[in-house]
């Protein structure tokens, strides 16, 4: 499970080995300062790996309620085919205090309550039919939103400056597919390179690109809406590229008789 354990160094208390190991293994002050202005979400890791009857959550760091939580060993979560939408979540608990530690713990749970509560953070969701196999071998960018038998990462929040953002897996997938389709638009090339190189992009960068590329309003789109708009951009590249609703050729000329 994800934990946030802080040793309490106080005058008159016995210094314990575990307290020093905690201090050694996690440079707390540096990390807290570095991510202070980041919104809650996954900081790094916490990827989902699919096996036949269980999911593995890989080691990672998440931010919740201003605190960093560390998962230093893979966590195994069993799942079943129910035909209903199921969400894998981190559920955070109230903090506890004893003479040596401030402790903030969590559990990784599978829940059919789709909306995440204030004390929860989504890791993925899926809707698995009985007799089918859960998969994550996406065939294309659209496939990321396939309803049945597919790991869905669209609703996952990643920590970023100011506000949470879209999974870097989704953005890298988009960047790779955009380049492979051969777009000649300079903004496409720049955005694709940035997506592949950085992964975690500020949400405003994504929405500005979408608005400019599609000629639509720049709004705080949801993760699902962002995916849908990015898929439209990929489809426009297949059809010849260019800003939608505008000529993909050179400059326009007007001849007056």
Q: Where do the model's predicted regions map?
A:
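N-terminal "first-domain core" detector
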Residues: 1-62
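Beta-strand-rich solenoidal segments
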Residues: 5, 9, 62-257
């Amino acid at each position: 499970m994800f934990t946030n354990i802080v040793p309490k160094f106080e005058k008159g208390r016995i210094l314990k080995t575990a307290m020093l190991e905690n201090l050694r293994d996690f440079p707390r002050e540096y990390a807290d300062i570095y991510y202070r202005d980041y919104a809650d979400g996954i900081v790094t890791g916490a990827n989902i790996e699919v096996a036949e009857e269980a999911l593995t959550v890989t080691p990672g760091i998440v931010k919740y309620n201003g605190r960093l939580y560390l998962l230093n060993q893979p966590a195994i979560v069993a799942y079943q085919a129910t035909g209903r939408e199921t969400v894998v979540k981190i559920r955070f608990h109230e903090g506890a205090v004893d003479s040596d530690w401030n402790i903030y713990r969590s559990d990784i749970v599978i829940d059919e309550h789709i909306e995440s509560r204030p004390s929860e953070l989504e890791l993925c969701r899926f809707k698995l039919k009985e007799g089918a196999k859960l998969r994550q071998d996406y065939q294309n960018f659209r496939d990321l939103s396939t309803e049945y038998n597919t790991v869905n990462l669209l609703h996952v929040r990643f920590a970023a400056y100011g506000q949470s953002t879209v999974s870097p897996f989704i953005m890298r997938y988009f960047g790779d597919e955009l380049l492979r389709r051969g777009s000649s638009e300079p903004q496409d090339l720049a955005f694709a390179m940035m997506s592949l190189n950085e992964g975690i992009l500020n949400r405003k960068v994504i929405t500005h690109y979408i608005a400019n590329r599609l000629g639509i309003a720049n709004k705080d789109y949801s993760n699902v809406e962002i995916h849908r708009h990015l898929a439209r951009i990929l489809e426009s590249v297949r059809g010849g590229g260019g800003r939608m609703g505008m000529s993909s050729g050179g400059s326009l000329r007007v001849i007056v008789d």
